[in-house]
Amino acid sequence: MAIQADGSAGEFERVVHMPRHIPDGIAFDEDGRLWIACHRPDAIYVYDLHTRRWDLFAEDWKGEALRGPTDVAFAGPNRDILLAAALDNLVVHRFDGVGVRGLRLNHPKI
């Protein structure tokens, strides 16, 4: 959704359609890709906004390890560590060496 010059919301656009998935938390990387934690089917996907293609980053088809990832975030001094919170087993998973850096967060002065 584009933000207009006056601050109002522009036209709504569906970015990705994920039938039979329950997407939850998201994070952007510096390449403009969207990282998506899917509570079901226990997976993390990476969606490229330019090519409109989504690729599987991590999956747990048995539901024994990721166990319902709900959020993803980039961490570390270089923002090159991916963290994924899991609702079903109350842990945060750490993925080192994902090959990208997370988008720097915007901290506006209010």
Regions found by a protein language model. Give the residues of each.
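Short loop/turn segments that connect beta-strands within beta-propeller blades
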Residues: A2-G7, D48-R52, D96-V98
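Surface-exposed loop/turn positions within WD40 beta-propeller blades
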Residues: D31, R40-P41, T51, R79, ...
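Flexible "stalk/tail and boundary" regions
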Residues: Y45-L56, D71-G76
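Blade-level signature of beta-propeller repeat domains, shared across WD40, Kelch, NHL, RCC1
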Residues: P69-I110
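Beta-rich, blade/repeat-based domains predominating
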Residues: V15-L34, G63-I81
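Structural motif
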Residues: M1, A43-V46, L90-F95
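Residue position within the beta-strands of beta-propeller blades
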Residues: I36-A37, A84
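A short beta-strand motif characteristic of beta-propeller blades
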Residues: G10-H17, R53-K62
